[in-house]
Amino acid sequence: MPVVTTDAESETGIPKSLSNEPPSETMEEIEHTCPQPRLTLTAPAPFADESSCQCQAPHEKLTIAQARLGTPVDRPVRVYADGIFDLFHSGHARALMQAKTLFPNSYLLVGVCSDDLTHKFKGFTVMNEAERYEALRHCRYVDEVIRDAPWTLTPEFLEKHKIDFVAHDDIPYSSAGSDDVYKHIKEAGMFVPTQRTEGISTSDIITRIVRDYDVYARRNLQRGYTAKELNVSFINEKKYRFQNQVDKMKEKVKNVEERSKEFVNRVEEKSHDLIQKWEEKSREFIGNFLELFGPDGAWKQMFQERSSRMLQALSPKQSPVSSPTRSRSPSRSPSPTFSWLPNKTSPPSSPKAASASISSMSEGDEDEK
């Protein structure tokens, strides 16, 4: 560990390290009672004026290499980061996370400038100092909050809080008549740079609000704030309220259009389904009809079968005539031969006809003899 003497001081009064050789007495042999990093997140970080470091052991200066190698548990590396922290956002949190994780065993102190200093050197803030203090207390990376932090770090302030290193982005911060308020810290070898988070800053957030001022004014009027609270004139208030009513009507019309579109889509889907079902049923009906009444349908075949049966019933087929050589069955008697006799009551129509009938009768008698 470097040996620090009162003679080895920079022009600003901040002591410098003379060498990197360890002293005759190691750090492990010195008992430290410095506050330890927070092990629980169930309570906010304390304020420095409520629980400041009361350690009586000598506070030897550390080099960055020594701090990165690690220090005893009871001697954490005390890292300081300061700022305004107005509208605390993720860029602030990431910067504090980098400061907290610079060394294996670190204790992060965060200084927050008061309203008077901030309004004097930078400008008006959205949040007051009490709100900004509380925002830092509830950040998980912060171990201690220093209220009313100085704009430019002095040797007395660094000695009072036993600060080992100062963490901030490496961009020169010109303010209070200086090109870089951290110049003397860099010269003393106590400055450790962090990286800025691009795309988000307090100024960017304020720019968004100013750019969309009408939108946010209408929003807050709609939520119950008065025109006086928003510093809005009577005419602008009426204009904003009228615009809110117009937006409500537009929203209702939009909702009606969306619902009507949904209804039309549902009707189209159902009609499409009905048409498909109708087509299926119609094809099924046509197929069944053709099976019954088509050219080869079941109805025609049934009609033909029934008609053929009826024809067979009405006109049965005659048995074939027996041949002359076939002998007659003895059980059956020969069918008698009928001779056509002239009707006695009706006289012959002519003498020739009478003679012809008599001759036929005589011939028949002769055959029987």
UniProtKB/Swiss-Prot annotation:
<dbReference type="GO" id="GO:0004105">
    <property type="term" value="F:choline-phosphate cytidylyltransferase activity"/>
</dbReference>
<dbReference type="InterPro" id="IPR041723">
    <property type="entry name" value="CCT"/>
</dbReference>
<comment type="similarity">
    <text>Belongs to the cytidylyltransferase family.</text>
</comment>
<feature type="binding site">
    <location>
        <position position="84"/>
    </location>
    <ligand>
        <name>CTP</name>
    </ligand>
</feature>
<feature type="modified residue" description="Phosphoserine">
    <location>
        <position position="355"/>
    </location>
</feature>
<feature type="modified residue" description="Phosphoserine">
    <location>
        <position position="335"/>
    </location>
</feature>
<feature type="modified residue" description="Phosphoserine">
    <location>
        <position position="322"/>
    </location>
</feature>
<keyword id="KW-0443">Lipid metabolism</keyword>
<keyword id="KW-0548">Nucleotidyltransferase</keyword>
<dbReference type="Pfam" id="PF01467">
    <property type="entry name" value="CTP_transf_like"/>
</dbReference>
<keyword id="KW-0444">Lipid biosynthesis</keyword>
<feature type="region of interest" description="Disordered">
    <location>
        <begin position="1"/>
        <end position="27"/>
    </location>
</feature>
<keyword id="KW-0594">Phospholipid biosynthesis</keyword>
<dbReference type="GO" id="GO:0007283">
    <property type="term" value="P:spermatogenesis"/>
</dbReference>
<keyword id="KW-1208">Phospholipid metabolism</keyword>
<feature type="modified residue" description="Phosphoserine">
    <location>
        <position position="346"/>
    </location>
</feature>
<protein>
    <recommendedName>
        <fullName>Choline-phosphate cytidylyltransferase B</fullName>
        <ecNumber>2.7.7.15</ecNumber>
    </recommendedName>
</protein>
<feature type="modified residue" description="Phosphoserine">
    <location>
        <position position="315"/>
    </location>
</feature>
<feature type="modified residue" description="Phosphoserine">
    <location>
        <position position="349"/>
    </location>
</feature>
<feature type="binding site">
    <location>
        <position position="169"/>
    </location>
    <ligand>
        <name>CTP</name>
    </ligand>
</feature>
<feature type="region of interest" description="Disordered">
    <location>
        <begin position="309"/>
        <end position="369"/>
    </location>
</feature>
<feature type="modified residue" description="Phosphoserine">
    <location>
        <position position="319"/>
    </location>
</feature>
<feature type="binding site">
    <location>
        <position position="168"/>
    </location>
    <ligand>
        <name>CTP</name>
    </ligand>
</feature>
<keyword id="KW-0808">Transferase</keyword>
<comment type="pathway">
    <text>Phospholipid metabolism; phosphatidylcholine biosynthesis; phosphatidylcholine from phosphocholine: step 1/2.</text>
</comment>
<feature type="binding site">
    <location>
        <position position="195"/>
    </location>
    <ligand>
        <name>CTP</name>
    </ligand>
</feature>
<feature type="modified residue" description="Phosphoserine">
    <location>
        <position position="362"/>
    </location>
</feature>
<feature type="modified residue" description="Phosphoserine">
    <location>
        <position position="360"/>
    </location>
</feature>
<dbReference type="InterPro" id="IPR004821">
    <property type="entry name" value="Cyt_trans-like"/>
</dbReference>
<dbReference type="GO" id="GO:1904116">
    <property type="term" value="P:response to vasopressin"/>
</dbReference>
<dbReference type="GO" id="GO:0005783">
    <property type="term" value="C:endoplasmic reticulum"/>
</dbReference>
<dbReference type="InterPro" id="IPR014729">
    <property type="entry name" value="Rossmann-like_a/b/a_fold"/>
</dbReference>
<comment type="function">
    <text>Catalyzes the key rate-limiting step in the CDP-choline pathway for phosphatidylcholine biosynthesis.</text>
</comment>
<keyword id="KW-0597">Phosphoprotein</keyword>
<feature type="binding site">
    <location>
        <position position="200"/>
    </location>
    <ligand>
        <name>CTP</name>
    </ligand>
</feature>
<dbReference type="InterPro" id="IPR045049">
    <property type="entry name" value="Pcy1-like"/>
</dbReference>
<feature type="binding site">
    <location>
        <position position="122"/>
    </location>
    <ligand>
        <name>CTP</name>
    </ligand>
</feature>
<feature type="modified residue" description="Phosphoserine">
    <location>
        <position position="329"/>
    </location>
</feature>
<feature type="binding site">
    <location>
        <position position="173"/>
    </location>
    <ligand>
        <name>CTP</name>
    </ligand>
</feature>
<feature type="compositionally biased region" description="Low complexity">
    <location>
        <begin position="351"/>
        <end position="362"/>
    </location>
</feature>
<feature type="binding site">
    <location>
        <position position="85"/>
    </location>
    <ligand>
        <name>CTP</name>
    </ligand>
</feature>
<feature type="binding site">
    <location>
        <position position="122"/>
    </location>
    <ligand>
        <name>phosphocholine</name>
    </ligand>
</feature>
